């Protein structure tokens, strides 16, 4: 490849920020004593590894302001880090501002979770979000990212979001945590969406076919440097992980999670060298071979 591991630069410039490693810790939890402890641990990991971090849904703290302190601690720990606030798509512009202010966020993730709400007995049944998302994105002072929560993004949705002021799209593909399954298990209605959705890979291909121009984040089953690399090849600017990081944190502790992230950094460097890619722009020129199943998917979706 005529390249050295010392000459690799896989940093990514997105949302007005230079991410030295194209990965961050994705939104998971918050609002309870146990969840706040997890967020503190994640913030320490993010700080030590120079990673961005997203907090879990702040809806509970917007409803009960006394719970906001648990979220605010993330900023106290990761004082100079890039933080994503997180609210649902039904929240007002005022609530969006409150969520951002709560953690002095650098960006806001607005999660869209129709397939999670429908199996819930108490879930929403009306989903008129696009106009509200655009209002928030056009008036908020920080970048706004629309985030799926494990069901992927289709061409139709990419094209709808192209007409809005959002800065980025987090595809949240199937393959990681399945919230439809979780909600079905605790629901009385048994509405089964276990197999619903597009995978992270399929969503990245959908973005290409929709000629997406928004910044792109790959989430959903990211568990290795190889998956980060594949996401970058297919057009993602960043990748992130929620469930995998949380599971490792609970099972092995924060030090082991940091070891995993360090290993990913080393492995990603080697993958760039192996493919003769000095940077992300060059890695997107890597020749691709698709499986028969993926070729079939592409053919049907053209």
Predicted regions and their residues:
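Alpha-helix-loop-beta-strand connector modules within alpha/beta enzyme cores
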Residues: 67-85, 127-145, 189-216, 262-271
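Glycine/Thr-rich beta-alpha phosphate-binding loop at enzyme active sites
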Residues: 105-129, 157-207, 250-252
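Hydrophobic faces of well-ordered beta-strands that scaffold small-molecule active sites
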Residues: 23-26, 51-56, 82-87, 106, ...
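An N-cap/entry alpha-helix motif that binds or orients negatively charged groups
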Residues: 1-15, 19, 293-295, 299-302
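Active-site cofactor/substrate anionic-group-binding motifs, chiefly glycine-
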Residues: 13-61
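Conserved, mostly hydrophobic/aromatic
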Residues: 25, 46, 108, 169, ...
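Metal-dependent enolase-superfamily TIM-barrel catalytic cores that perform enediolate-based chemistry
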Residues: 93-152, 157
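Alpha/beta catalytic cores of nucleotide-metabolism and tRNA/nucleoside-modifying enzymes
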Residues: 191-215, 219, 223-302
């Amino acid at each position: 490849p005529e390249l050295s591991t010392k000459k690799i630069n896989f940093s990514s410039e997105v949302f007005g920020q230079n991410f030295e490693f194209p990965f961050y810790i994705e939104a998971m939890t918050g609002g309870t004593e146990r969840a706040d402890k997890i967020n503190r641990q994640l913030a320490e990991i993010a700080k030590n590894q120079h990673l961005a971090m997203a907090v879990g849904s702040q809806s509970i703290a917007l409803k009960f302001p006394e719970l906001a302190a648990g979220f605010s601690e993330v900023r106290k720990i990761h004082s100079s880090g890039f933080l994503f606030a997180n609210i649902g798509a039904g929240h007002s512009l005022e609530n969006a501002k409150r969520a951002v202010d709560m953690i002095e966020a650098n960006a806001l993730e607005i999660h869209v979770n129709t397939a999670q709400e429908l199996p819930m007995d108490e879930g929403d049944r009306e989903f008129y979000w696009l106009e509200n998302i655009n209002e928030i994105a056009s008036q908020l002072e920080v970048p706004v990212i629309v985030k799926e929560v494990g069901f992927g993004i289709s061409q139709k949705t990419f094209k709808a979001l192209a007409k809005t002021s959002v800065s980025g799209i987090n595809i949240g593909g199937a393959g990681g945590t399945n919230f439809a399954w979780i909600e079905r298990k605790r629901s009385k209605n048994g509405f089964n969406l276990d197999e619903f959705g597009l995978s992270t890979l399929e969503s990245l291909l959908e973005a290409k076919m929709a000629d997406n121009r928004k910044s792109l984040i790959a989430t959903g089953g990211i568990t290795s440097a190889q998956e980060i690399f594949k996401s970058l090849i297919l057009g993602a600017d960043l990748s992130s992980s929620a469930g995998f990081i949380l599971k490792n944190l609970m099972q092995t502790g924060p030090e082991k999670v940091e070891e995993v992230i360090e290993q990913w950094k080393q492995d990603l460097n080697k993958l760039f060298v192996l493919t003769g890619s000095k940077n992300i722009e060059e890695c997107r020129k890597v020749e691709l071979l698709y499986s028969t199943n993926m070729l079939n998917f592409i053919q049907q979706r053209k």
